[in-house]
Design a protein with these regions (language model features):
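Patatin-like phospholipase A catalytic core
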Residues: 1-458
Length: 458
C-alpha cells in the first residue's frame, strides 16, 4: 500500500497544482473585470465575458510563441548557469594570464571550440600523442518506436572534436545507420559558437544529470514536474540526420513546441531536434563508446556513489556492450571481491580490478584489457585518509547532490584518487608493454615534496 501511495503522490500534487493555478487565474480575471460572486461560479463568469476568455487565451499563446522565438529554449533553463560554473572552475583554471570580467569573473578565453582539440594529421616522421576526447551524452528516446528501447529509452550520443551524432539499427537490414555531422559547424551561425560547439557546452550536456527526460530513469510525472519548475539541465540539439542549415543553427528557432515535448516526455530519435542529457542516463562509466572502437586497453573509474559495492553501473555497461557489439567483458567475482571492503573497519584488498574484453569469440588475439578502478580504502593507505574516513562515514561515497566540499573533503578525495591511480598505473604500464612488446620500467614513487601549482583558480 505504501508503494502505491508513493507512486500516486506526484500525480496528486500535479492535480492540486493545476487546480490551484486555475483558481488563481479565475480570481485574477474576476478582479480585472469587476465580476462579483464566487470564483467557482462558472456559468456567471461565462455569461459575463463569453469572448474575453478565448481572446485572452489567444493573446497568451501569441505571447508565448513570441517569447519562445526570441529566447532560445536552451537558454530558458539552468543549463547556462551550470555550464558557466564548470567552465570557470575547470577550464578557466588552466588559462595562463587569465583576464576575467571584473563583475562576473568569467572570461571568453576560458572555453574553446571542441573542434580545436582535433588531433592533426602527422607525417611519417612524427606522431601526435594527444588523447582524443569523447564526451558521452544520452539521446533520449522516451517515445521511440523501436521495441528494443522500451527499457533503455535512450541511445548513446557522443561528442568528439571531429563529429557529433549517433547510430541506430537499420529496420530494413542487420546494419547500423550512422548519423554524424561535423562538430566545427554545429551552431556556427550563432554568435557565441562561430567555430562550432564549445568544449564547455559539450561537457555540461555530458553532466546534465538533472533533466526532465533521463533515459531509462524517465518517468511522466517527474518530466512534468521538472519542466514546470524549470529544473532543466538538458539540451535540445538539431538532428545530425537533418538539414545542414538547422545543424549550423543548432537549436530550435521556436522552442515552445519542443518545450511541450519535454514536458510530456515525447522525445524521439527521428524528430528535427533531439533532447540530450547526462551520458550516465545511458551508460555511466564511458565504456560503451570505447568498446565500439575496440580499444585494447580500457581504464574505467567508477565514482557513482556505490557504498554497497553492487557495481550496478559496471553490470549495465557489460550488458550494453554484449547486446550491441557482441563484446564480452570478463571480470571475475574474485577480482570484484578485492575492491569490496570487508571486516571492521571495512577495508579493501586493492584499489582496482582487472579483466579481459573478448571482442571476437574464439580469437584471443583481439582481446582487450579492462582495468576497473573503484573508490575503496585499504589498510595500507595513508593515516590521514584512514583517519578522515573514521570521522566522515560517507567517505568515499558521498552523494553527488553534495556540491559544497570544503578543503579537507576535496583534498581527501584527491589523495584517494592519486593512491588508486598509482596503484593501477603498474598494471596499465604492463598492459601497454605487452601490447607493444616493449618492457616498461617501474612506476615512479611519490615525490618527497609536492610541487605547488603556480596559481589555483577555483
Amino acid at each position: 500500500m505504501v508503494n502505491y501511495l508513493a507512486r500516486l503522490t506526484p500525480y496528486i500534487f500535479l492535480l492540486g497544482l493545476l487546480v490551484a493555478l486555475s483558481l488563481l487565474a479565475s480570481k485574477i480575471a474576476h478582479e480585472l473585470v469587476g465580476l462579483e460572486g464566487s470564483i467557482l461560479s462558472l456559468p456567471k463568469a461565462a455569461a459575463f465575458y463569453p469572448w474575453e476568455v478565448p481572446a485572452l487565451a489567444i493573446v497568451c499563446l501569441a505571447l508565448a510563441l513570441l517569447i519562445s522565438w526570441r529566447v532560445d529554449v536552451n537558454e530558458f533553463s539552468i543549463h547556462y548557469l551550470y555550464r558557466n560554473r564548470l567552465v570557470r572552475c575547470y577550464l578557466g583554471a588552466s588559462v595562463e594570464n587569465r583576464k576575467p570580467q571584473p563583475f562576473t569573473g568569467f572570461s571568453d578565453a576560458d572555453d574553446v571550440p571542441l573542434a580545436r582539440l582535433q588531433i592533426p594529421a602527422t607525417g611519417t616522421d612524427g606522431v601526435d600523442d594527444r588523447p582524443l576526447p569523447i564526451l558521452n551524452t544520452t539521446l533520449n528516446v522516451v517515445r521511440g518506436k523501436e521495441l528494443g528501447l522500451q527499457t533503455r529509452k535512450a541511445r548513446s550520443f557522443p561528442f568528439t572534436p571531429l563529429c557529433v551524432g549517433f547510430t541506430r539499427p537499420d529496420p530494413a537490414s542487420s546494419d547500423l545507420e550512422s548519423y554524424f555531422a561535423p562538430a566545427s559547424i554545429l551552431g556556427a551561425d550563432r554568435p557565441d559558437s562561430k567555430n562550432g560547439v564549445r568544449l564547455g557546452t559539450a561537457t555540461a550536456i555530458s553532466g546534465a544529470a538533472v533533466s526532465p527526460n533521463m533515459g531509462f530513469y524517465s518517468a511522466p510525472d517527474l518530466s512534468f514536474l521538472m519542466t514546470v519548475f524549470d529544473v532543466r539541465l538538458g539540451w535540445w540539439l538539431a538532428n545530425p540526420a537533418g538539414a545542414i542549415k538547422k545543424w549550423r543553427i543548432g537549436s530550435p528557432t521556436i522552442g515552445f513546441y519542443w518545450l511541450l515535448r519535454e514536458l510530456f516526455g515525447a522525445t524521439t530519435d527521428d524528430s528535427e531536434y533531439l533532447y540530450l542529457s547526462d551520458g550516465g542516463h545511458f551508460e555511466n562509466l564511458g565504456i560503451y563508446e570505447l568498446v565500439r572502437r575496440r580499444c585494447k586497453i580500457i581504464v574505467a573509474c567508477d565514482a557513482s556513489g556505490d557504498a554497497l559495492y553492487g557495481c550496478g553501473d559496471l553490470h549495465n555497461a557489460m550488458g550494453r556492450c554484449r547486446v550491441d557489439f557482441g563484446a564480452e567483458i570478463e571480470i571475475t567475482a574474485d577480482e570484484i571481491g578485492k575492491i569490496t571492503p570487508a571486516g571492521a573497519p571495512p577495508r579493501a584488498m586493492a584499489h582496482f580490478a582487472t579483466g579481459l574484453i573478448h571482442y571476437t569469440p574464439g580469437n584471443p588475439a583481439d582481446d582487450g584489457i579492462f582495468i576497473y578502478v573503484k573508490p575503496a580504502l585499504q589498510a595500507s593507505d595513508s593515516a590521514d585518509l584512514l583517519g578522515y574516513s573514521r570521522t566522515n562515514p560517507a567517505f568515499p561515497h558521498d552523494s553527488t547532490v553534495d556540491q559544497w566540499f570544503d578543503e579537507s573533503h576535496f583534498e581527501n578525495y584527491r589523495a584517494l584518487g592519486e593512491a588508486a591511480g598509482r596503484a593501477a598505473l603498474g598494471s596499465i604500464r604492463n598492459a601497454i608493454g605487452a601490447l607493444l612488446t616493449i618492457p616498461m620500467g617501474p612506476v615512479a614513487p611519490l615525490p618527497a615534496t609536492p610541487v605547488p601549482n603556480k596559481e589555483f583558480v577555483g
